[in-house]
Structures are given as C-alpha cells and as structure tokens.
C-alpha cells in the first residue's frame, strides 16, 4: 500500500464505471495516506454502507432493509413514567459504552408509551452509534442470521420486537430463548434485544393445554423462563385520573395552548370526558385528545 501514490489511484479511478455518487460520508484529502487514520476513526464511529446512512431498519426477505421515514418522537415528548424510562436510558447508555447491559422487556397496558420509549431512545442516541432493527415476531427464528449479518459492524444494534407473545403451540420461542441467553451463539457484544408486550408471561396457555399436559409444571416453568430471560423487565400501567390529567396539561404546555387562550379547567374537564368515552385513560389517549384540540384551534372550531 505504501508504494501506491496519487497518480496510481487516479489511473485506477479512471477504469471504474461512471457511478453517480453523493456527498462523501467522510472528509477526503488529496493525499489519501494522510487521511487513512481519520477514515478508520470515522467509520469505526459511524459505520459503513447502509449503517452510516440510516439509523433504523427492518428485517424483510432475509435482508436488513433501511427505513427511510422514522417516528421523530423524542424523550422530551413523553410525559411522566420517569422511573420506567430512566431504567431504559441507563441500560442503553451502558450498552453504547460497551459495558454490561441487559435485554429489556417493556410490558403493560396498551397506549402507555412502551413502543414510543424505544423509538425515542433511538432518536436520542443514534449519533453515538446506536442503530435499530425491528423484526416481526414471525422472524424470531432468524435472530441468529440477523446477528451474523451485523457481527462485524462497529455500530451498536437494538433488535426490536413489538407486541411480543406466543401461542403455546408456537415453537419459535425457543430461538428467542437461545438468543436471550444460554446458547453458544446467543451472546453478541454489539446487539441487544428490546421487546414490548401487553403480557407479562409471553406464552399464552389455553385450557386444553392444561387438561392434556401431564407435565403441566414443566410447561409452566418453560413459559415463565422465557420472560425471565430478559434481564430487565419494566412495567407500564395506565395512569389514574390525576396522572392522566397531568399528562394532558404537560402536552398542552408543549403545544403553547395558553397562547390561544385555552382555559385549563375546561381542557382538563374535556380530556376526562374524552377518556371516559374511549374506555380508559392512557398517555396515548391524552395525546390523541391534544391532537384533536390543536386541530380545532387551528381551524377556528369549537372543541
């Protein structure tokens, strides 16, 4: 390599096809040898190929595919649930720094911000080398293949599984158990698994299972073992009325409703009516109500 000079490189470049290229991902210098250390440092920090140009991916047809449009939500957009969220933040920061970190199960009521927390974590830490690959539950059996494809990348990857649960006759959960812990291929320093679920026990058991299984105790232990393989389990429950209205008020403050003369007492009264009509209080419901009010304000309509 030391015997190659700038003229040699120019001759090589002239033989290449006329590819259309965009802006270089790393700074270039006419004396490429002086830039070698900087290029190595740049790609060690920013990755290469699709991992340098994108931060979110899906698993499709046995390929890691970039996601061009991602949820822009930030941690500051999420209200309350600080204890739960801080546990995810601390674990993620430890993972990014190369320190021991746990696979995480976020479980609890619908609409409480489990998925939004994971999306916000990516938006907060992608500049520190964090990337995310979302896979459907049906692709759990491909976990070892996914990890193999990113094994040599310098980036840190959250493998994200949303709304995770299994039927009792679904054997693919064995692959997840192996990936979480226990198998020789189950550990990889640049990957971690974050999953969300509405169920604490991820494997659904039906009555026929209980009647027909003479080894019910062993079956139950196997089912419980899957949840226990997540080193960190974080619970998100629906807020009570006071907490719900507090979320509504904080979201209204972010949207500067006071500048439009919105009466706070009326806002909170209407917010509680909104929740009652929709069968319960949740952070998602609070945001939907605030979106409704903002839309009415901007159109000059009564809300």
Language model features with spans:
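C-terminal alpha-helical "lid" subdomain
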Residues: 237-303
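Conserved P-loop NTPase "ATPase switch" module shared by AAA+ and STAND
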Residues: 136-137, 152-172, 176, 199
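Conserved AAA+ ATPase "SRH/arginine-finger" region at the nucleotide-binding site
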Residues: 213-224, 231-245
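Interdomain "pre-motor" coupling segment immediately N-terminal to P-loop NTPase/helicase cores
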Residues: 6-66
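N-terminal pre-Walker A segment at the start of P-loop NTPase domains
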Residues: 68-93
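Conserved catalytic/switch belt of AAA+ P-loop NTPases
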Residues: 168-211, 218
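Walker A/P-loop
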Residues: 103-133, 137, 145-152
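Loop/turn-to-beta-strand initiation segments
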Residues: 130-131, 154-158, 187-194
């Amino acid at each position: 390599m030391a015997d190659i000079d700038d003229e040699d490189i120019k001759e090589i470049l002239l033989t290449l096809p006329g590819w259309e290229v965009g802006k270089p991902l790393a700074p270039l210098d006419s004396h490429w040898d002086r830039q070698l250390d900087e290029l190595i440092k740049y790609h060690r920090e920013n990755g290469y190929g699709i991992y340098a140009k994108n931060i979110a991916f899906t698993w499709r047809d046995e390929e890691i595919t970039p996601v061009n449009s991602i949820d822009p939500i930030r941690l500051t957009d999420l209200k309350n649930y600080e204890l739960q969220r801080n546990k995810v933040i601390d674990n993620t920061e430890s993972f990014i720094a190369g320190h021991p970190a746990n696979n995480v199960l976020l479980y609890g009521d619908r609409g409480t911000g489990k998925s939004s927390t994971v999306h916000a974590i990516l938006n907060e830490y992608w500049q520190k080398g964090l990337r995310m690959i979302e896979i459907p539950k049906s692709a759990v059996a491909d976990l070892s293949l996914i990890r193999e494809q990113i094994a040599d990348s310098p980036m840190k990857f959250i493998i994200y599984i949303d709304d995770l649960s299994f039927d009792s006759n679904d054997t693919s959960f064995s692959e997840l158990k192996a990936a979480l812990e226990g198998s020789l291929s189950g550990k990889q320093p640049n990957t971690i698994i974050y999953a969300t679920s509405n169920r604490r026990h991820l494997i659904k058991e039906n009555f026929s299972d209980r009647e027909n299984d003479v080894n019910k105790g062993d079956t139950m232990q196997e089912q419980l073992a899957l949840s226990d393989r997540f080193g960190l389990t974080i619970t998100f429950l629906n807020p009570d009325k006071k907490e719900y209205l507090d979320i509504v008020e904080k979201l209204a403050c972010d949207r500067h409703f006071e500048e439009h003369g919105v009466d706070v007492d009326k806002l909170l009264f209407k917010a509680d009516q909104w929740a009652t009509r929709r069968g319960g209080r949740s952070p998602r419901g609070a945001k939907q109500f605030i979106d409704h009010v903002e839309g009415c304000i901007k159109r000059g309509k009564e809300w």
